[in-house]
Amino acid sequence: MKKFLTTAPVVAAIWFTLTAGILIEWNRFFPDLLFHPMG
């Protein structure tokens, strides 16, 4: 359990960084696809 508590925040930080990076890259190449439903 102690090992899980130390690895979970690290995995979460990496996951959020990857997700944010993918969204930023996707928005840079396909801005219309990302924002079209909201507009």
Curated annotation (Swiss-Prot):
One of its GO terms (cellular component) is plasma membrane-derived thylakoid membrane. SUPFAM superfamilies: Subunit IX of photosystem I reaction centre, PsaJ. One of its GO terms (biological process) is photosynthesis. It is a single-pass membrane protein. Pfam families: PSI_PsaJ. HAMAP family: PSI_PsaJ (MF_00522). May help in the organization of the PsaE and PsaF subunits. This is Photosystem I reaction center subunit IX. It comes from Synechococcus sp. (strain CC9311).
